[in-house]
Amino acid sequence: MPRTSLLTLACALATGASAFSYGAAIPQSTQEKQFSQEFRDGYSILKHYGGNGPYSERVSYGIARDPPTSCEVDQVIMVKRHGERYPSPSAGKDIEEALAKVYSINTTEYKGDLAFLNDWTYYVPNECYYNAETTSGPYAGLLDAYNHGNDYKARYGHLWNGETVVPFFSSGYGRVIETARKFGEGFFGYNYSTNAALNIISESEVMGADSLTPTCDTDNDQTTCDNLTYQLPQFKVAAARLNSQNPGMNLTASDVYNLMVMASFELNARPFSNWINAFTQDEWVSFGYVEDLNYYYCAGPGDKNMAAVGAVYANASLTLLNQGPKEAGSLFFNFAHDTNITPILAALGVLIPNEDLPLDRVAFGNPYSIGNIVPMGGHLTIERLSCQATALSDEGTYVRLVLNEAVLPFNDCTSGPGYSCPLANYTSILNKNLPDYTTTCNVSASYPQYLSFWWNYNTTTELNYRSSPIACQEGDAMD
C-alpha cells in the first residue's frame, strides 16, 4: 500500500512540500545532510520471511509511483493476495512438533537466544485458528485489506462516479473472501453495502479457465518441487547453537526450519516477535532463499507450465486493456492466493532469472526474491494510462505494471511516460509470447475455455457480508 518515502517524509511534514521535493539546497548547519547515506532495506526481516510474513512494499527502481504528469490512469486491473494469516494446519503440526522438543527439557529458565521463552506463549490460541486471517496486532490481515482499500480509494477513486454498482471478484476461499470484503469496505466506504457487488468465483477444477485459480493437474514439471529439502547449511549451525545453550532439546536442521516458519508468521498476529532474534541475519537470509526456491519451482517460472496457468489472467486482462474503460469498465479488483499471482508474473515474463536457481546455495542478486513478490497482502496492479504527447513519447495509451506499490518495468518495453509500455507494443509482445492454457494443461473440453466473469457478473450485494459463523480452521474452498 502507498507509503510516503522515508527519504522525504521529514521535509514534507515540516514544509508541506511534495513528497518528492528535495528541500533547501543549503543545509541548516554544515553538519546536516540533505540525504541519509544509510539504507537498510536489505536488512529488514520482512524481506527474508518469504511469503509468510506481513506485507511490505517492493524495493523500487526509483520510478515515481504516481502517474506521469502527462498521463491519467483510466483503468485499473488488480489481483491481491489475501491478508496476513495464521499458519496452515499442516505447518501448524510441524511447528507444534518442533516446539514440543523445545519444551521437552522441562527447564524453568531457558538460556541464551531462547531466554525469552520464560515468558513467551504460542500466538495461535488453538487449532481452530489455523488457516484463518489474523485480526489482532498492527499487521493484522483484515486491517491490511481495509487500509489497502482506503489507500486505493485515494489513488483511484476518480474512476468511480459514486453511483454505479461496481463488481469485484474473489476466489471461493474463506480468507480470500474476507480480504475482498474488507478491501471493499475500505474503498467504497459508506457505499459498500449498496454500490459494490462481490462475485465469488469457485476454486473448483471444473471452472477450467473461467477462474482466478486455474489448475494444471497434468503438470509434468514438478520433479524439482517434489524433491525440495527446505534445508541449507545455516540451519544446522542454528540447531547446534540452540542445543548448546539449552542441552537436551536435540533440535535438528528441520526443526530449525519449522521454528523459523513459526517465527515468520508471528508478526501477522502480534506487534513484536522475540523469535526473530533467536536466529542470525545470515540464517534469515538462508530461510528467505529456501522460500524463494519453493515458489520458483512449485508455482513460478521454475515450473515450465506455470506461465500457461498465468496466461489465463494475462490474456483476459489484455482484452480489458484494449477494450478500454468505455467498453469494459474502469475498476477490476480481484482477490486470490500467492500461488495464483506468481504464475501471472511468469506469463508476463517479468522477474525471470537468467538461469534456474541453485538448490545448494543462495543465489544472491537474483530477481526472484519472494518477499518482494508475494508477501501477505501482496498485489499486482496493471494501470492503463491515457497520455498526452511529450518530447519523448506520442499521445496515446500506455500500460504500467505495479507490484506491491513499486513500478515494475515491462522488460525492454519502457519507451512511454514514466517508463511505461505502449499498449500496442504490450499487446504485440503478449500475443506473441503467451502460451495456451487449455492445450498445455490438457483442460477438459467440458470445462470453460476462457475467463468470462469480468464480462458476465452479478450486480447484487447479497455476498458482500458473511451470513454464517466462522468455522474452525476456515479456509476450505467453496464450490
From Swiss-Prot:
Glycosylated residue positions: 191, 315, 458
The entry's keywords: Disulfide bond, Glycoprotein, Hydrolase, Signal
Annotated signal peptide: 1-19
Disulfide bonds: 71-387, 128-472, 216-441, 225-298, 413-421
InterPro entries membership: Acid_Pase_AS, His_Pase_clade-2, His_PPase_superfam, Histidine_acid_Pase_euk
Single GO MF annotation: 3-phytase activity
Active site: 82, 338
Pfam families: His_Phos_2
UniProt keyword Ion transport present: no
Transmembrane feature ranges: none
Catalytic activities: 1D-myo-inositol hexakisphosphate + H2O = 1D-myo-inositol 1,2,4,5,6-pentakisphosphate + phosphate
Protein EC: 3.1.3.8
Top EC class, one word: hydrolase
Gene3D superfamilies: Phosphoglycerate mutase-like
Any Gene Ontology CC annotation: fungal-type cell wall
Keyword Methyltransferase: no
Similarity field: Belongs to the histidine acid phosphatase family.
Quaternary structure annotation from Swiss-Prot or TrEMBL: Homodimer.
Function: Catalyzes the hydrolysis of inorganic orthophosphate from phytate.
PANTHER family noted in UniProt: ACID PHOSPHATASE PHO11-RELATED, MULTIPLE INOSITOL POLYPHOSPHATE PHOSPHATASE-RELATED
The protein's name: 3-phytase B
Species this chain originates from: Aspergillus awamori (Black koji mold)
